[in-house]
């Protein structure tokens, strides 16, 4: 199973599904929803969730700096939502059941910080790769593409405009090495993937 979560869209999803099917990999639809205030990861649970994901993305494009919580309040059925920011997770927990809301542990975050958020909100942790490039050697290419997209030079890129070199595609063993104290979060990612039927 593999999820593609483009930023604010389903840009590569059709090709992703074609490649997954030809490789006998179960594809999961999703999106990394980001604006200048908030960020969440959304994974589709079922067909109704896919329809809601399309509505979420449309609403995000209609109002790019709108409140992600307001959009999800209307369209959270059939999707799983993962976040790492305690303020948006608190807000989302008022209307999304804990069976569909999770704390995201991703590269670059301290396991202890994520664990304390999980304990405070009584939400399970799910580990993700937050992948933006194939391996570490592609980080320079990522930086160059981000500079082009931002109409900037490499030296003038804002740190929020690119990902660190931690965001490469890891094997299961490499994920265990990255998060040695969070094996339950890695198991939860498998459990969540099994629940996604797109």
Where do the language-model regions lie?
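Phosphodiester-processing cores and adjacent nucleic acid-binding clamps
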Residues: 1-198
């Amino acid at each position: 199973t593999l999820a593609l979560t483009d930023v604010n869209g389903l840009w590569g999803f059709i090709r992703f599904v074609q490649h997954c099917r030809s490789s006998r990999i179960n594809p999961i639809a999703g999106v990394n929803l980001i604006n200048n205030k908030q960020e969440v990861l959304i994974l589709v649970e079922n067909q109704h969730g896919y329809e809601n994901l399309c509505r979420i993305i449309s609403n995000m494009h209609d109002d790019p700096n709108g409140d992600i919580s307001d959009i999800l309040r209307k369209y959270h059925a059939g999707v799983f939502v993962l976040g790492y920011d305690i303020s948006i997770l608190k807000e989302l927990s008022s209307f999304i059941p804990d069976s569909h809301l999770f704390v995201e542990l991703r590269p670059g975050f301290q396991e202890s910080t994520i664990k304390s958020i999980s304990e405070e909100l009584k939400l399970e942790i799910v580990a993700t790769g937050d992948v933006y490039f194939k391996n570490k050697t592609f980080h320079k290419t990522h930086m160059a593409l981000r500079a082009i997209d931002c109409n900037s030079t490499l030296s003038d890129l804002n740190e929020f405009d690119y990902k660190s070199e931690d965001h490469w595609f890891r094997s299961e063993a490499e994920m265990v090495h990255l998060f040695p104290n969070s094996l339950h979060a890695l198991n939860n990612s498998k459990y969540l993937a099994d629940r996604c039927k797109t």
